[in-house]
């Protein structure tokens, strides 16, 4: 009888441990996308606007705009095709020079007199082609870290992206498109004032050093391309998230803007599998997510 009780107790303890293990490995509760409103102090707010275009409002109220392809973007809500709808912008980040990422950055920079930052050497080319004036470019090095708002503000690090970065420019003298060097493609690790970290991956294929970058910076949220053709598709994006990065949250991006970008969020979630520990958040363009 004593032996039978011991066996039952051991089985119960094993079951309890398994339950506890399941709880610890469950996806983090996902914040729900919502319509935009006034900034909630202490929160990181992420507004995805289609493709890779993103507006991040930091807990301290700084507004960082990434890859603002808006006026020509079929996924951008009509309201945000008016660039003034972005509100005051404190910083523009560009991951690379392709038109669906460079987008409206020169117009926003010029109108608001806010600098364009790039970690891969694009800035001098923007100036030489007359897209912006030299005072509106703030280049920094790939793998470099900047703190443009001081030691207590957000911290931005440029990290590797496996992509290309041609800058296609229409020469006004010939009315023909020309292809120019656009610097190196990058992604950005953005650490907020409260320590919350976002990895905006820009355009990238799968590469093994995603694991090293994730171990070094430990991002809470990965904004990851899933459309395929030019970037990772759902399967590779799932490998990146599940096996290399392991963030608490993931927002899929860079899909659905052209027939070539066929990957979908549902395919991405299916590829991750039922045991994934990352909560996938799928906002509609123009919906804001607060963390």
Swiss-Prot record:
The keyword Hydrolase is assigned to this record: yes
Keywords: Hydrolase, Plasmid
Protein name (record): UPF0173 metal-dependent hydrolase Rmet_5695
SMART domains hit by this protein: Lactamase_B
Molecular-function GO term, any one: hydrolase activity
Xref: InterPro entries: Metallo-B-lactamas, RibonucZ/Hydroxyglut_hydro, TAT_signal, UPF0173, UPF0173_UPF0282_UlaG_hydrolase
Species: Cupriavidus metallidurans (strain ATCC 43123 / DSM 2839 / NBRC 102507 / CH34)
Keyword flag Hydrolase: yes
Family, as annotated: Belongs to the UPF0173 family.
Lineage top rank: taxon: Bacteria
